[in-house]
A protein has these predicted regions:
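Membrane-proximal basic amphipathic "stem/tether" segments
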Residues: 227-258
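Nucleotide-sugar donor-binding/catalytic module of glycosyltransferases
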Residues: 1-214, 254
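Catalytic core of nucleotide-sugar-dependent glycosyltransferases
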Residues: 197, 202, 210-236
Length: 258
């Protein structure tokens, strides 16, 4: 079973080497890496080209202007030839070198369309320093309406699901990943499995862990995502969504306090 990994880059010279090493060191080798660059102005492409031979024909890249990270992801999905598609951002890392092997085994042993798991948030300049954790759980009907959703960087899905139900709606900006997972899992009820295993180390300060403004915009778009997909949510939904995250952040701050 081939896994297609999509990595979007834009001026990512400070972090992309770590990401490439993380992929290169995986024990599972039936992969392809698709790097979708947004016309970087730094040394990102030079770094990618240095790694090209190391991937022995399994790395392909393009560099052209895009309409943002989700547009880049859509380009990658269009290029993918694997059975399963996953996304690893250019500032993120796999938790260890057996992540893809475990994901492949889970797909092979379970007749499911999608798999997701846990992630840890780490310091931008020290990826061994944990800031907080995101522990997932198994989906059940209407979970999304109660504030649940998978951590998107851990979300691996069969390519045929994208072909059947579509790709990222780039009008949703910072929460297009939420809308896509809502559409796939809650609306179309694709089969899915939660792996109780940490899959990703996600740097703080990235596209979806940044400013308060992005968080506010993201939550507005989440409500629009429900409307687009024909769901009515309770007026208490924002509380259901944000309160557990706030509690989790406080717990993690105490847990990982210096």
């Amino acid at each position: 079973m081939k896994i297609s990994i999509i990595t979007s880059t834009y001026n990512s010279e400070k972090t992309v080497k770590d990401t490439l090493d993380s992929i290169l060191n995986q024990t599972y080798k039936d992969i392809e890496l698709l790097i979708i660059d947004g016309k970087s102005k730094d040394n990102t492409l030079e770094i990618v080209r240095r790694y090209e031979k190391m991937f022995q024909g399994k790395l392909r890249y393009i560099s052209e202007p895009d309409k943002g990270i989700y547009d880049a992801m859509n380009k990658g999905i269009g290029m993918a030839t694997g059975d399963v598609v996953g996304i690893l951002n250019s500032d993120d890392l796999y938790m260890d070198n057996k992540v893809l092997e475990d994901i492949a085994n889970a797909f092979n042993q379970n007749n499911v369309d999608a798999i997701y798991g846990n992630l840890i948030f780490v310091e931008e300049h020290d990826t061994n320093k944990v800031v907080r954790t995101w522990k997932g759980s198994q989906y059940y009907p209407e979970s999304f309406l109660n504030g649940w959703h998978p951590a998107h960087p851990t979300f691996y899905v069969r390519r045929e699901v994208y072909e059947k139900y579509g790709v990222f709606d780039i009008s949703f900006n910072v929460s297009a990943d939420f809308e896509l997972m809502l559409r796939f899992i809650e609306k179309h009820r694709i089969s899915n499995l939660y792996m109780d295993r940490t899959l990703i180390r996600m740097r703080m300060g990235g596209e979806s862990t940044g400013s308060i403004g992005k968080i506010i915009t993201g939550n507005k778009n989440v409500l629009r995502a429900f409307e687009k997909n024909g769901f009515k949510v309770s007026v208490f939904y924002p509380v259901k969504r944000l309160l557990p995250k706030a509690i989790d952040m406080i717990k993690n701050k105490l847990k990982f306090k210096k």
